[in-house]
Design a protein with these regions (language model features):
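Non-heme di-metal
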Residues: 2-389
Length: 389
């Protein structure tokens, strides 16, 4: 089965927002006026290799206890695990069973022991790849000469997270979009980001029942803002849906999945991996903290690029909201969430830093892919998405 060379999506109303200069489209107005929009299950994508082909074939069948899934193995190497299309799509499908579900798929697959066994093998391979790319750092400061334990794990984590946030990585997607991107490249950027932002905050919320006390309170403070303080139209996922509509892109959940490469799926798969395993709660907290501490400046640049290309003020609210909210979240995440967790459980210091560094690595490889394609004059997507005229 092959993927079409392009998909046509509804265009903005021409008198309000031609595809080359997105504005407040009719679709955008409908989204803003329908805050309770309900996501359906994700559509099944085309396979990207033998593993995802076998998995999709399996998922189309009724879930039964007697099924043998030992053939669902990925034959790649750790060096390729983080960016391999076949593995990343397979992980995404397995994880999506825990979110919106998959269209036409028996929901009992979510907890099928054979599928969980197969997914655990894929996760081990992804973790092996991450260990190659992001070596573990248990302590960044002084250690006990006898045990090797950090003498100041909280200080180590605060210093490590701060240094990571202050590093202005290159290549920078936000700088490129602010200064150089074409409308089509900006549209591609939004397509990549739709894999996370249409379920923004959901993956990190897995940490809530795994934390307690003030640390849980810090996380809920952040997540409450992500979910719009209880106002559906203000949910960040809903603001992003409005942004997609203004650029003539589909707002249907996961409809653009076939277009994005494995390197894009890595970002969401990482959060699901950390979120669905209690033992990785430290990494999940570190990942979220890295997100919050490195969000305000890039979103300000995205907003400038959006406006430079004629984007509407209403749609720009998604970026503007992140500039303001994440400036506050940064301090809560660093001092109350991450440092608070390590203060309560010092042995998780290394995991917190690992999760943060994995977030930075995923951003880096995605940026290298996108900017590499754009500077070469080709699409960063597997197949381009075009807005209808």
């Amino acid at each position: 089965m092959t993927v079409d060379t392009a998909v046509t999506v509804p265009a903005p109303v021409p008198e309000l927002a031609p595809a080359s200069a997105p504005g407040a489209s009719a679709a955008e107005v409908r989204v803003a006026g329908t805050p309770a929009l309900h996501d359906g299950p994700a559509p099944l994508p085309a396979p990207r290799g033998p593993l995802s082909a076998a998995l999709l074939s399996t998922l189309r069948r009724e879930s039964t206890r007697s099924v043998d899934l030992r053939h669902l193995l990925w034959e790649g190497t750790p060096a390729d695990a983080c960016t391999d299309d076949d593995l990343q799509l397979s992980l995404w499908l397995a994880y999506e069973l825990h979110y919106r579900g998959l269209a036409g798929v028996d929901e009992r697959w979510e907890w099928h022991p054979e599928l969980l066994w197969a997914r655990a093998r894929w996760e081990d391979q992804l973790l092996a790849g991450l260990e190659l790319a992001v070596p573990r750092v248990v302590a960044t400061g002084a250690t006990d000469p006898t045990t090797g334990a950090a003498l100041d794990p909280v200080g180590d984590v605060v210093a490590g997270l701060t240094a990571l946030a202050e590093a202005d990585g290159e290549p920078s997607v936000s700088k490129f979009l602010m200064r150089n991107a074409t409308a089509e490249q900006f549209r591609e950027f939004l397509t990549h980001r739709s894999m996370y932002h249409l379920k923004e905050a959901d993956p990190h919320s897995w940490a809530i029942p795994r934390l307690s006390g003030a640390v849980k309170g810090a996380l809920i403070t952040i997540q409450a803002d992500e979910y719009g303080g209880g106002v559906p139209a203000a949910m960040h996922a809903q603001l992003f849906r409005r942004l997609l509509a203004s650029w003539g892109l589909s707002t249907t959940y996961a409809e653009l999945l076939d277009r994005v490469p494995g390197v894009t799926l890595l970002s969401t798969n990482l959060i699901s991996l950390f979120g669905l395993h209690r033992r990785w709660r430290g990494a999940l907290v570190g990942h979220l903290t890295a997100f919050e501490m490195s969000s305000s400046v890039p979103n300000a640049r995205y907003a400038r690029g959006h406006r430079r290309l004629g984007g509407s003020e209403a749609a720009a609210r998604f970026f503007d909201e992140h500039v303001v909210a994440d400036a506050v979240h940064e301090q809560i995440a660093l001092h109350d969430l991450a440092a608070g967790l390590v203060r309560a459980e010092p042995t998780l210091a290394g995991d917190v830093l690992f999760g943060a560094r994995c977030a930075a690595y995923a951003d880096q490889v995605a940026a290298e892919h996108q900017i590499g394609a754009w500077t070469a004059g080709v699409s960063s997507l597997r197949t381009p998405v075009v807005a209808a005229a």
